[in-house]
């Protein structure tokens, strides 16, 4: 499985303009907590960055070298938080190998901010839907006030 991940990562990264990924302190705490339950989470997050987030926001070069954006049904904009320069998104379809047999319906959700001009992503929150139903809107508001 490790070899497959390395090959996929190489193929995907060759086709894209890289996005700069950062994590908030709260995200790091949430991630560390979930990592104890779901051991494959670190590799799964890397794969989600390459296979879902980057193709959705930046695109992938097709066989003719033309950049095409991926229509991802996995990513949703969170209403009332988006501006022209900043999009607050939620990644719903997150495949976690530690949750065998569930595929993209793992129940893990990631909330992040995408900066259009700088091509960067700040991860705000990660949670398991079995423990928490929806994203923390207060945390998003706090994040927005701290960066704007």
What are these regions (language model features)?
Residues 23, 41, 87, 104-107:
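Amphipathic alpha-helical interface surfaces
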Residues 4-17, 93-148:
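Enriched for short, Lys/Arg-rich terminal
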